[in-house]
Amino acid sequence: MNKQSLFHIAKRGTLPWYISAAIRGCAILFALIVCALVTMFMTGENPISIYGTIFHGAFGTVRKTWVTFQNLAVLLGISLAVTPAFKMRFWNIGAEGQVLIACLATAACMICLGDKLPNGLLILIMIVAAIAAGALWGFLPAFFKARWNTNETLFTLMMNYIATQLAAYYIIVWEVPKGAGKIGIINQNTNAGWLPQIAGKQYLLTILVVAVLTVLTYIYLKYSKHGYEIAVVGESQRTASYAGIKVERVIIRTMVLSGAMCGLMGLLLTAGTDHTLTTTIVGGRGFTAVMVSWMAKFNPIMMIFTSLLLVVLSRGASEISSVFGLNHSFADILTGIILFFIIGSEFFINYKVSLRKAGKKEA
């Protein structure tokens, strides 16, 4: 006898957006319930207090709220940068390095030219240098992929290590004071190369730039000819070639764009908010951006919400550790559970699971 499984799984058609949103909402609700149970069993703490602390850690004060939105803007900006490549099915895991190399280029301009040029001209040079550095870091793996079909995942990953070691080298070259192993605040006395504050807020410029970038990326991917070519290449390179699209050119152009956008985020990090350079200045957001982009299905508008979710969880994790005296890993456990449910909900959006009816037995 041939035994049939109890469940039948079939591919769904495209669901209306409100049904997809409802499935994701249910996934988050179930995740919070599971997190509450885990919290009670592992710590004995009231889960409501834990969730309240997470919210307070992200929005408890005006300053915390500004920091949350600044972190949201940086993560969203990097996520937007990797999205064109991902939509093309080019697995760019190198955003961390592309942002970091732009931070290095920005810091180099601030340190070497800070006392030699007017501030307006210096900032203009910094913008060009940061975008060019990020674009170069995106161009190299794209060129090798287009010409020799190299593995872009490994290539972009290795470029991260090169960027990290370059940054580490120049941090020692520029360290202040000598032997400190760090640069410190660049041009702290003169503020040369510091991007201007808006309404007295150093975070507001980053937020505004990323807001504009979100709209432009959405229009570019959805309504431009380049966006159409990216979508076609992502579906099938062979089909794209038959349609007269030059696949190699699209690959290189798209990765240069992704790298340039990462470069802009590197400029905003170094010259806009941190005013320094460290090997960890990007803080792993280049890798988190991969998750943000995938969870949002490469939709720049949806990325606002996925970025906000991850930033709130991250900010809340730090607050939990300090308020309850819990190991920071516990907050990571809660974050992992929530992300597991959210990612798992995509299965139920794309597939229908039903009980198989009892049929005739087959010999």
Feature roles, as predicted:
Residues 1-30, 36, 41, 235, ...:
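Cytosolic-side transmembrane-helix boundaries in multi-pass membrane proteins
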